[in-house]
Regions:
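Membrane-embedded transmembrane helical bundles of large multi-pass transporters/channels
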Residues: 1-208, 360-536
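Structured non-transmembrane domains adjacent to transmembrane bundles in polytopic membrane proteins
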Residues: 217-406, 428
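Juxtamembrane extracytosolic/periplasmic "stalk" immediately C-terminal to the first targeting helix
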Residues: 211-217
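Intrinsically disordered, low-complexity regions
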Residues: 77, 173, 177, 211, ...
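Short, contiguous strand/loop micro-motifs
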Residues: 162, 210-211, 246-249
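A generic short-segment signal for beta-strand/edge and adjacent turn/coil regions
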Residues: 176, 182-183, 206-211, 288-303
Length: 536
């Protein structure tokens, strides 16, 4: 409807994006780990999608104030330009003030939602969420300062008042507003929908596959996956990593104890292979090595002689696969039965505790730790499961406290404020259950990207709750004796329309993630579009 207002919002959003990258670079200089990665390619689009929401709310509310001013004091003003500078100043100031309070709550919850990415075990997601949170703050700052200033400085378009903003009550607004007369029906329908969603939530699984983080359109990645699929002869081995004076009497004793522990463990298969088993096999064909090993005894010189030889060129030809370059670390490889991620995590925890106890009892300065691809994947998967609970729970608690605090201040009554805050919070939690339920029913898995979908749903969804409840309170103040249907219908017809436009831009921005070459980001975009629609 107005290219000027559209340009104002978009230009300020672009400036905010530039400031975001500048701040990210400054934080990097100050020592904060901010790594640019593939996920950050989508940050400008996401900031545009979310940031336009704030500008949209401000512009829509200012135009609404101008319309109301003409209705309250008819002077034949038919376009936006017909208003005097003073009238525009009053409308811009009032619209900005009324919007900024709700936007402040919205930006805070949005930032909390994206900062919940810091609970993720993936560094690229930590940087991704932090940068977006910084960007949202800059966009909010410009939306309530620079945007009103530009609207005041630049003359408005000769846009007819009736076309500047559609605030007429339509059939959809009337129907939504009438729902306040049948709260029981709304609750029953919500429960009926929530039952299958809760069952789907119970079926939701955690899944993590490193292959999803590779772009298989790149030739070198295709070759890597081909080698992994076609030429891998056995499952990836696990490793016991022994640090300390490996080539010593105590080191040999600890090595034997670790091998015995691995061999006796019912969940391991095959014979563990390490430096000493390799040396025993090689001594039959190497007379010099055989002489050194035959001379091993209680004196340290014999062990030192063997260590010195192992670090020579001939020795490294034998020991390089199991012994590092200064003989201070060795690995013992072994196999374990294929387990699911939870069983693997439990296996790692139990075996690590046993090996740590063996190292402590050895009497020397040794450590023994476990490693291996399957253990890493199990640990990452466990972190994903924990992060889903921690991030969602943290954001839910912060939002509940914030809603209770805001309503307590407005109502000037702790009990009524707590009750209203809790009532506002319940629909948000229902949306989280629905989102996770849909993921479970459709076969989506929680991974390192979708782990924060619950927190983001709460963070962005509370925007709509705050905007609508704030507008409802304004309508109550304007017409305290009116019917609740009138309050809700007017709120939906005005703020509700702006919320719908904001939801469209946000969903459109996140849907762009479907063009990402990374499967997890594609899934994240798809799930979040559903989450935004449900939150609205």
């Amino acid at each position: 409807r107005s290219k000027r207002d559209t340009a104002n919002v978009l230009v300020l959003t672009v400036f905010a994006i530039l400031a975001t990258y500048g701040m990210a670079g400054l934080l990097t200089v100050l020592g904060v780990k901010m790594v640019f990665n593939a996920a950050m390619n989508s940050i400008p689009i996401l900031l545009l999608a979310i940031g336009v929401d704030y500008g949209l709310h401000v512009v829509a509310r200012i135009r609404e104030e101008l319309q109301d001013k003409e209705k309250a004091d008819p002077q034949g003003r038919e376009t936006l330009r017909d208003f005097s500078i003073e009238a525009r100043r009053i409308a811009i100031r009032k619209g900005t003030i009324l919007t900024s309070a709700a936007l402040m709550v919205a930006i805070f919850t949005d930032m909390v939602g994206f900062l919940s990415f810091r609970f993720s075990s993936q560094q690229f997601l930590v940087s991704f969420g932090t940068v977006i949170a910084i960007g949202l703050f800059f966009i909010y700052l410009l939306s309530i300062t620079a945007l009103p200033a530009l609207m005041m400085i630049i003359p408005p378009k000769k846009l007819p008042l009736q076309k500047s903003g559609k605030n007429d009550i339509g059939p959809v607004s009337s129907w939504i507003g009438s729902l306040v007369n049948v709260p029981q029906k709304v609750i029953v329908v919500t429960i009926l929908i929530s039952v299958p969603m809760f069952l789907g939530f119970q079926q939701l699984e955690v899944g993590f596959d490193t292959r999803d983080n590779f772009d298989d359109s790149v030739p070198v990645v295709q070759d890597f996956l081909l080698i992994a699929d076609e030429f891998r002869s056995s499952p990836s081995p696990l490793y016991a990593v022994l640090d300390g004076d490996v080539i010593s009497q105590d080191g040999r004793a600890l090595y034997d104890s670790v091998v015995l522990e691995l061999s006796d463990n019912p969940k391991t298969t095959g014979l563990p292979i390490g430096i000493w088993s390799v040396l025993e096999d090689s001594r039959t064909t190497n007379s010099e090595l055989d002489a050194l090993m035959s001379g091993l005894g209680d004196d340290e010189s014999s062990w030192a002689a063997l260590e010195t030889w192992l670090l020579t060129e001939d020795g490294r030809n034998i020991s390089s696969g199991n012994l590092n370059s200064d003989a201070s670390q060795t690995v013992i490889s072994f196999q374990a039965a294929t387990l699911d991620w939870q069983a693997t995590a439990d296996f790692e925890s139990e075996l690590s505790a046993n090996l740590a106890e063996i190292a402590d009892d050895s009497g020397g300065d040794f450590t023994v730790q476990l490693s291996g691809r399957s253990l890493i994947l199990a640990q990452v998967t466990a972190d994903v499961a924990d992060s889903a609970v921690i991030s969602t729970g943290t954001v839910a608690a912060v939002i509940l406290l914030m809603l209770v605090g805001i309503n307590t201040v407005r109502q000037k009554d702790v009990i009524r404020g707590a009750a209203r805050g809790f009532v506002t919070w319940i629909p948000l939690m229902v949306v989280v259950v629905w989102v996770y339920g849909i993921m479970g029913l459709t076969g989506y898995q929680l991974n390192s990207q979708t782990v924060t979908i619950g927190a983001l749903t709460l963070g962005l969804g509370v925007d709509y709750a705050v905007h609508l409840t704030t507008r409802l309170e304004e309508e109550v103040e304007h017409a305290p004796s009116a019917d609740p249907v009138v309050w809700s219908t007017k709120s939906v017809a005005t703020t509700g329309r702006a919320m719908f436009g904001a939801a469209l831009t946000t969903a459109g921005g996140f849907s762009v993630l479907n063009f990402s070459s990374l499967v997890p980001l594609q899934l994240f975009g798809q799930v979040f579009v559903v989450a935004i629609i449900l939150a609205l």
